[in-house]
């Protein structure tokens, strides 16, 4: 009965982002939300987190997550809220000691094989504060606003787990024995499926998979480490929730975006700012999201407005969601974000 009620909720959703993806056509208006729309660019965010001791503490504080998630929707009238969290929650569930160091970013005690990872018996127990936040946000959001849940792509999470932090060379993970890498990715994939299913059950009406490190791979490695696990996640979710909108984001995948769209089964794809929009329009035959350069938005308002108009003109007749090609930079002036949202909503 629970699954039937979830299916009914998803099917009847009036949220504009999920509707654009599911119907595969552009509505009356182009929807807009921004990756990292909740965060350090907002003064209300900085006030809300000033007394917290760590980023992970924020991620597991239900009421704070609700507040932070809703802030950009309230300020800018975004068409979607994305739950305030992090792609490394799955790594934390697997027993890795995830921490965030100012000026360095995420750090993790690195592992070399899947046996070092904890076997999570009940992912819901560890992530319940986040899941409860999803439920509370959904209750507070107007029905026309989407609530986006998310997770990191298994390859990206694996690269952090093995490297221990962000890397420019990815030497540890690329030199790991293929069978060990495969086992780690498989374990991450299974946990990711469980986590995303729970997010949907608690109220998310769209899911995004952030494969932020996809661009380091090519050929067979891209197929095995990005496409294969993504396809497994998509198949598992759509097996339980048919036609559920899933956005993939294989950042910096270049021409491999085409293979990703054709082989994974994702419902829509978010393109990074290096993807030529004319190429995307010609080659990617599913709903598109993107792809303004966040640096333009942060440092050159007039050029950002000009580029936004060009993107809209290119994708106007397609099922399209306006977004950035990566996350909002912390020093982005809020007046620039407001001008961007106003422009998109006026089209």
From Swiss-Prot:
SUPFAM superfamilies: UROD/MetE-like (SSF51726)
EC number: 4.1.1.37
TM annotation in the entry: none
Reactions listed under catalytic activity: uroporphyrinogen III + 4 H(+) = coproporphyrinogen III + 4 CO2
The keyword rRNA-binding belongs to this UniProt entry's keyword annotation: no
GO biological process, one term: protoporphyrinogen IX biosynthetic process
Residue numbers marked as site, Transition state stabilizer: 86
Keyword line: Cytoplasm, Decarboxylase, Lyase, Porphyrin biosynthesis
Similarity section: Belongs to the uroporphyrinogen decarboxylase family.
Subunit-structure text: Homodimer.
Function: Catalyzes the decarboxylation of four acetate groups of uroporphyrinogen-III to yield coproporphyrinogen-III.
This protein's name: Uroporphyrinogen decarboxylase
């Amino acid at each position: 009965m629970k699954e039937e009620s979830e299916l009914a909720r998803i099917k009847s959703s009036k949220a504009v982002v999920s509707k654009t993806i599911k119907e595969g056509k552009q509505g009356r208006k182009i929807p807009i939300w921004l990756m990292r729309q909740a965060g350090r660019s907002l003064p209300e965010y900085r006030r809300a987190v000033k007394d917290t001791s760590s980023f992970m503490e924020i991620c597991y504080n239900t009421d704070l997550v609700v507040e932070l998630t809703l802030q950009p929707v309230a300020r800018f009238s975004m068409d979607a809220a994305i739950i305030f969290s992090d792609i490394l929650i799955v790594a934390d569930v697997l027993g890795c000691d995830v921490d965030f160091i100012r000026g360095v970013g995420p750090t993790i005690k690195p592992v070399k094989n899947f046996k070092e990872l904890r076997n999570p018996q009940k992912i819901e127990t560890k992530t319940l504060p986040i899941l409860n936040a999803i439920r509370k946000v959904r209750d507070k959001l107007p029905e026309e606003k989407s609530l986006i849940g998310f997770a990191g792509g298994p390859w990206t999470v694996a690269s952090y787990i093995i490297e221990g932090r962000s890397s420019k060379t990815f030497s540890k993970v690329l030199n790991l024995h293929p069978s060990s890498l495969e086992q780690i990715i498989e374990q991450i994939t299974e946990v990711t499926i469980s986590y995303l299913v729970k997010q949907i059950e608690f109220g998310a009406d769209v899911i995004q998979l952030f494969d932020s490190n996809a661009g380091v791979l090519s050929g067979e490695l891209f197929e095995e480490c990005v496409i294969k696990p993504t396809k497994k996640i998509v198949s598992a979710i759509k097996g339980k929730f048919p036609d559920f909108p899933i956005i993939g984001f294989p950042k910096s995948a270049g021409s491999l975006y085409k293979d990703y769209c054709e082989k994974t089964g994702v419902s829509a794809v978010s393109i990074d700012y290096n993807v030529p929009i004319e190429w995307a329009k010609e080659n990617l035959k599913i709903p598109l999201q993107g792809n303004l350069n966040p640096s333009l938005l942060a440092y050159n308002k007039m050029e950002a407005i000009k580029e936004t108009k060009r993107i809209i003109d290119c994708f106007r007749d397609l099922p399209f969601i306006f977004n950035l090609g990566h996350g909002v930079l912390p020093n982005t002036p809020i007046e620039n974000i407001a001008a961007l949202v106003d422009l998109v909503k006026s089209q």
